[in-house]
């Protein structure tokens, strides 16, 4: 757990001075002025316990910690921050929601606020303040956090996931770039396998990567878990086609993907064993920062997700919303901190620190410096705009959030691709589970 002081803030802020963003004393002075004029005044003696997902990019974590320290220095709020793996964030947030204690704020994944809508502090005032000031929210991000007209949380950012590939392997396979249709993408993966430079995508319980690529395939074929009225429609010809396509694709993969979590493909790619996968920008950053992997970094490129038979993007990107529990003793401090995070003086520096790992959800940040700092970052600037909400065409809410958290779509594909079940049984299992959720 990190307990932040002004000393750690001033000491740590110098690293980003070269970006032109406010740092050091200048940022502290701005933060203090912001706190005095903020619509939300932190309660006297406020102390916030904040859980966040464990960082994949060190510079992002550093920029976040500097922001936390600035908030503490400016408002006097004691900030205790700790990190958990992607897989552990939702269970630990659920424990806090059920017990009414342990956390004030939880920064999690996908539709986390929708899992316990009656346990969160409504954020309409924060959402309106930020939206009006910074050009409005991207559609999928807003939908992720809303129940009707109620904002259950704030979509801080999107962890964009796109195709990460070795250019040399693609070219050796006879392709100049990643094909932007499903048929061509399958041909590429077959050619990569033939050259012993395989692709690999997780079929295990990888909260970010597995949900992302398997929903992309399902939606790209026109298959969905539920329709616009939340009627379960997973048992369809479109789902059949999606499963068959995925099975063919999985036969080209590197061994072991059935047990992969969210860090497995990072490790395999950086070890030189994997040549195409879906991931955030973290693989490229890790290679770029390691002098021993200079050649790997230069050979690593990114591409948009190919478009499926329905002819339009069907991306499930990893929204990372933050929520405040309604049992917090410090609601004003909670709202103030969330608003503080997304102010330009903080947010653009934070995005630069994240180096493309985080994508903005407020339209004004389309011009943030991070997107032109490195040409390989640019693809990730599109993540919040090309995404569908995690509910697909259904209603975002607790039921859709439960289906994501329980890996129903992931397990359906994994059951068929690994041979644990045939096609019909794989769908039937998912259908039964969905009907229990949506009854």
Model regions: which residues?
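Hinge/lid segment of periplasmic solute-binding proteins
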Residues: 36-42, 109-162, 180, 186, ...
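N-terminal secretory signal peptides and thylakoid transit peptides that target proteins
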Residues: 1-20
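Short, solvent-exposed loop/beta-turn-alpha elements that line the ligand-binding surface or hinge
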Residues: 39-45, 124-139, 203-205, 222-242, ...
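C-terminal lobe and pocket-closing loops
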Residues: 40-42, 111-114, 118, 128, ...
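Extracytoplasmic "Venus flytrap"/periplasmic binding protein-like
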Residues: 66-137, 146, 168-180, 268, ...
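Glycine-centered hinge/linker elements that transmit conformational signals in sensory
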Residues: 189-192, 229-258, 301
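Conserved C-terminal helix/tail region of periplasmic/extracytoplasmic solute-binding proteins
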Residues: 42, 73, 78, 171, ...
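Extracytoplasmic/periplasmic solute-binding protein
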Residues: 148-156, 161, 183-232, 238, ...
